[in-house]
Swiss-Prot record:
The name this protein goes by in its record: Prenylated Rab acceptor protein 1
Quaternary organization: Homodimer. Interacts with VAMP2 (synaptobrevin-2), GDI1, and PCLO. Interacts specifically with prenylated Rab proteins; strongly with RAB4B, RAB5A and RAB5C, and weakly with RAB4A, RAB6, RAB7A, RAB17 and RAB22. Interacts with NDRG1.
Membrane-protein topology: Multi-pass membrane protein
Organism: Homo sapiens
InterPro entries named in the record: Prenylated_rab_accept_PRA1 (IPR004895)
A family per Pfam: PRA1
Gene: RABAC1
Tissue: Ubiquitous. Strongest expression found in placenta, pituitary gland, kidney, lung and stomach.
GO cellular component, one term: synaptic vesicle
Cytoplasmic side: 1-78, 113-131, 166-185
Entry GO MF terms: GTPase binding; identical protein binding; proline-rich region binding
Length: 185
């Protein structure tokens, strides 16, 4: 029991929570709970990418039904596909990586300064929200030069194409308790 607590303390010291393996940078609260729910409801990747389950829908009604049901069923998987596309976009754009480093570096410096003492400019105490807005203002030219706007729209477009294609062409999972649909004769 003591060894298990020591391992958990070591993991927390490394920046990971022993129970969830989520980074400590994600504050506890609604964001962490949402991410934990997504991880808990993720569907098996083997069924998500099974090529034998892809087929062309017969008609528009089946296409719409597939879209709705697959987006609902694979919602957590689609969130991680979206996060993967964001990661791919950031890693393949060195200038965007530099802009993000400048922004997060400025935020980290401001965070360390607020731990030491309050920031005072022209005799007035500057709130943390204004400090982070200043960091964003300083980083804005870097984001503009890196083409962050086009990167955002690329990620959104790629996400819609990938998720829309998967949801439209992946056959619907059989759900327990689903009513049998009878065709009119």
């Amino acid at each position: 029991m003591a060894a298990q607590k020591d391992q958990q303390k070591d993991a927390e010291a490394e920046g990971l929570s022993g129970t969830t393996l989520l980074p400590k940078l994600i504050p506890s609260g609604a964001g962490r709970e949402w991410l934990e729910r997504r991880r808990a409801t993720i569907r098996p990747w083997s069924t998500f990418v099974d090529q034998q389950r892809f087929s062309r829908p017969r008609n528009l009604g089946e296409l719409c039904q597939r879209l709705v049901r697959n987006v609902e069923y694979y919602q957590s998987n689609y969130v991680f596909v979206f996060l993967g596309l964001i990661l791919y976009c950031v890693v393949t754009s060195p200038m965007l990586l530099v802009a993000l480093a400048v922004f997060f570096g400025a935020c980290y410096i401001l965070y360390l300064r607020t731990l030491e003492s309050k920031l005072v400019l022209f005799g007035r105490e500057v709130s943390p929200a204004h400090q982070y807005a200043l960091a964003g203002g300083i980083s804005f030219p870097f984001f503009w030069l890196a083409g962050a706007g086009s990167a955002v729209f690329w990620v959104l477009g790629a996400t819609l194409v990938v998720i829309g294609s998967h949801a439209a062409f992946h056959q619907i999972e059989a759900v327990d308790g689903e009513e049998l649909q009878m065709e009119p004769v």
